[in-house]
A protein has these predicted regions:
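A domain-start/cap signature at the N-terminus of enzymes
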Residues: 20-70
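Gly/Ser-rich "nucleophile elbow"/oxyanion-hole loop immediately N-terminal to the catalytic nucleophile
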Residues: 62-69, 112-143, 147
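Short beta-strand element of the alpha/beta-hydrolase
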Residues: 68-78
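Short amphipathic alpha-helix adjacent to the substrate-entry channel of hydrolases
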Residues: 84-101
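Primarily recognizes the serine-hydrolase "nucleophile elbow" in alpha/beta-hydrolase
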Residues: 126-129, 135-180
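Short beta-strand/loop motif that positions the catalytic acidic residue
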Residues: 183-187
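C-terminal catalytic histidine-bearing segment of alpha/beta-hydrolase fold enzymes
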Residues: 204-282, 288, 293-303, 308
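Extended non-globular C-terminal regions
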Residues: 286-414
Length: 414
């Protein structure tokens, strides 16, 4: 399973440091041992008790009380913005009754020891300080933060599930120690979308309880209406395990909502989308609601010649996109700016004037990928004091993603 974290030492370190993670028993709330914090309000910085230099943003839902136990989601942003996911999803936390914690320190580029200490400090906060249900501790992340969340879920234990947005698992030769419930979310314009599609197949083979959500969007924290699927997923998984009572009304509402979406897929003739939505519907409600009718519909789609044709087209595009990404890497410093202007203009013309929606989304992903490649290349050569290469990388960055390029220059004082 491909990723950017490759050292087995990282896995061993996390396993050792977090081997004493939260247990799997449930007890009654004890207000005497719970830190009083204002509910229904985001607290931007709460200092960890174990390491005072480490902090997190906190949100207690409006219905929070120390007399009850609440599920918690610990969020990891790639830029260390603990408050960002809390601001986006606090209404969902209120609706479903979740505590939200967002790391202020975990971010891309940290060494293994620092990341391990941060994670250890955060998880120590889930015991004793707030009224948390130890059977329902979840980790969530976006981009590099999704890889951190997955690493915790796969190797720590004590986490019921992982919500991975915009990136998949870290790469490792080590076998997973745990199989948490897992849901991935990616936009059609996300350069990591194909990675998550492939990961979904691998999780099927590995017998994970999992689901995968695709939406029309870019490489970013998902919109609230998309993220709500993840909250529903964690609720349904908890119902299956008997952690919370079965909520028939919630289940039926979800089924009806998905049936409407599937109906629209049929109207537009998008059988790949229809297939994906049927698969997810079955995964969500399996063990909670009859799935026989949905499985029959899925079989009908899979046996149709038009679906097979659309699926073959999709696989061809994925192969083409992988080759194009490699070409962008290979040509990054060897081609001049005029060549890059023509390349990027070609993507933009296909996006604005193209009639093949699959090609349009592919070009959006390639532009997004080139933006990331430019950013990473710029930082790498700048740290080596290669000013000419840095100038070249920034010029490409300014063409493909001018807004983020300006922000990067401002951050660097350039």
């Amino acid at each position: 399973m491909k990723s950017f974290l490759r050292s087995p030492l990282w896995i061993i370190m996390l396993a050792v440091m977090m081997g004493c993670g939260p247990g799997n028993t449930r007890t009654n709330g004890n207000s005497a041992s719970v830190t009083p914090v204002e509910k229904g309000k985001i607290i931007p910085k709460v200092t960890c008790r174990k390491y005072y230099t480490i902090s997190y943003a906190l949100y207690l839902p409006k219905n929070y009380t120390a007399a009850l136990k609440f599920p918690v989601i610990i969020a990891f942003d790639p830029h260390g913005s603990g408050i960002l996911p809390l601001e986006k999803y606090k209404d969902l936390a209120d609706k479903y009754g979740y505590i939200l914690m967002g790391s202020n320190d975990s971010k891309n580029g940290l060494d293994m020891n620092t990341s391990g200490v941060i994670i250890d400090a955060l998880f120590s906060e889930t015991s004793g300080r707030y009224s948390i249900d130890s059977t329902r501790i979840y980790v969530m992340g976006f981009s590099g933060g999704a890889r951190i969340a997955s690493m915790i879920g796969l190797y720590q234990g004590g986490t019921a599930g992982v919500i991975g947005c915009g990136a998949g698992f870290p790469a490792t030769n080590q076998p997973v120690r745990f199989k948490p419930d897992y849901i991935s979310i990616a936009g059609n314009a996300d350069f990591n979308m194909n990675e998550l599609i492939n990961l979904d197949k691998q999780l099927d083979e590995a017998k994970f309880t999992h689901a995968s959500i695709l939406f029309n969007g870019k490489h970013a924290w998902p919109p609230v209406e998309i993220m709500e699927n993840a909250f529903i997923w964690t609720e349904f998984c908890s119902m299956r395990k008997g952690f919370i009572p079965k909520n028939d009304s919630m289940i039926l509402n979800f089924v009806h909502m998905q049936e409407k979406i599937i109906g629209k897929d049929k109207e537009t003739g998008d059988e790949v989308a229809e297939h994906n939505h049927l698969v997810n519907l079955i995964r969500f409600v399996d063990g909670l609601n009859s799935t026989e009718d949905f499985k029959n519909k899925l079989s009908t789609v899979e046996n149709s010649s038009s679906y097979k044709k659309q699926q073959n087209r999709l696989q061809q595009l994925i192969g083409k996109e992988m080759k194009e990404q490699q070409a962008l890497n290979d040509n990054f410093f060897s081609k001049d700016i005029d060549w890059w202007k023509k390349k990027i203009t070609n993507y933009e013309l296909r996006i604005t004037k193209g009639k093949d929606s699959s090609d349009v989304w592919m070009c959006k992903r390639l532009k997004s990928y080139l933006s990331l490649l430019s950013y990473m290349s710029y930082n790498r050569v700048l740290s080596s004091n290669d000013t000419l290469a840095a100038k070249h990388a920034m010029e490409i960055y300014e063409i493909v993603d001018p807004e983020n390029a300006d922000n990067t220059k401002a951050d660097k004082g350039k």
